[in-house]
């Protein structure tokens, strides 16, 4: 797994985020992940700041997490959306698909993130802060 270095610490509330979107700078508790995953039964949407190593997880749309991270000082260019599927194991738990990933100016012309290096960074941050596909 890629070395994550020092994670950014967030002190106090960042914005008026919906209660079903959580900003992570450390590993999420399994009970909290279970609560967030209830919306879609077996999946939770999340957005990763690949530079600050933060995750905004939960919500109905990726844009909810994107906005929370922007409010916390993230840069748009560093934010990428994905879906986490608990119980699918390490190789199948991350789906690198989101409307916020459509960025022709960054070389990504579809909802699916295609850059292998970015995918690996997201994978490492996901495994550190969210999980590795373990069942809830």
Where are these regions (language model features)?
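Generic structural hydrophobic/aromatic packing signal, biased to beta-strands
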Residues: 43, 47-50, 94-96, 122, ...
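Amphipathic, interaction-prone secondary-structure segments
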Residues: 60-91
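Well-ordered alpha/beta subsegment
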Residues: 111-136
């Amino acid at each position: 797994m890629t070395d994550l270095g020092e994670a950014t610490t967030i002190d106090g509330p960042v914005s008026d985020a919906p209660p079903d979107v959580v900003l992570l700078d450390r590993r999420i508790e399994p009970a909290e992940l279970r609560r967030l995953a209830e919306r879609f039964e077996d999946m939770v949407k999340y957005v990763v700041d690949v530079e600050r190593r933060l995750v905004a997880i939960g919500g109905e749309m990726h844009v909810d997490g994107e906005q929370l991270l922007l409010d916390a000082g993230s840069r748009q260019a560093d934010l990428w959306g994905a879906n986490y599927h608990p119980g699918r194991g390490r190789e199948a738990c991350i789906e690198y698909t989101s409307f916020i990933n459509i960025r022709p100016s960054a070389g990504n012309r579809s909802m699916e993130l295609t850059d292998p290096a970015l995918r690996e960074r997201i994978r490492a941050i996901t495994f550190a802060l969210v999980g590795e596909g373990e069942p809830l």
